[in-house]
Amino acid sequence: MHGTPTEADLTRELSEDLKDAWERLRETATEFGPQRIYASHNSIMFSRKICYFFVRPKKKYLEVWFFLGRKIENSLIRQTMPASKRKIAHHVRIIHRDQVESPITDWLKEAYDVSESIRTPAKVKPRGRG
């Protein structure tokens, strides 16, 4: 893989189960509304104005990270960490397409819906006086 990877590059080596899970995850996300889906390094990003979730395809699972304005306590969440002052990153592991359902799909939809409101505002440079 030379240059910028594509979505196909990142998913080519997945097992059939993981490919099915990836396709279902992607289809589910596209139903949320307008967005940009693109490969970046070893991840596939899902973005409105900013990224609201991304997937890192691994050999045995899909590593999914999504961003919310609140922390979720659930056994499906493997890890959480602050992503900014207003955003908390949540990590789930997907190994089969049957996992791509509620509550994971609800959290992804929430991440899509709140991505604009939890965005860290751009810093405005103070105007010089005079």
Where would I find each of the regions flagged by the language model?
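Charge-dense, helix-prone N-terminal extensions
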Residues: 1-130
